[in-house]
């Protein structure tokens, strides 16, 4: 869960919206988790991608594959068991990945630092 929390916090730091974490482990062999978020611009999408990569690099975890960075509308980041989708709001609504994976368990990630 540390890796998931790191990714969610990195997205939140760059003001990504509607961050959803889906446990897909019982539904597919593609991975264990999807993390999906919305951004308002290409610049914000790239900022989120860069921040996720930076924070994961700090944990010595490298992105296995990345698609869509140049376009900036929808970037997929593959961390093996965690797949991150950083999308503009329009394609997110159109493709509705959450509905496609409706049987997945939604995970709540607490990003507050308790003292």
Residue positions per predicted region:
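Polybasic/polar functional segments that serve as interface/processing modules
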Residues: 1-30, 39-75, 89-93, 100-115
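Active-site beta-strand termini and strand-to-loop segments that position acidic
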Residues: 77-79
């Amino acid at each position: 869960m540390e890796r998931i929390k790191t990714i969610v916090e990195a997205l939140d730091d760059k003001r990504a919206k509607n961050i959803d974490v889906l446990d897909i482990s019982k539904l597919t062999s593609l991975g264990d988790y999807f993390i999906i978020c919305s951004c308002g611009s290409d610049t914000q999408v790239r900022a989120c991608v860069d921040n996720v990569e930076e924070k994961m690099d700090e944990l010595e975890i490298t992105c296995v594959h990345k698609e869509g960075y140049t376009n900036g509308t929808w970037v997929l980041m593959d961390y093996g068991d965690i797949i991150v989708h950083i999308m503009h709001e329009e394609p997110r609504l159109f493709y509705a990945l959450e509905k496609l994976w409706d049987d997945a368990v939604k995970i709540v990630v607490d990003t507050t630092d308790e003292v």
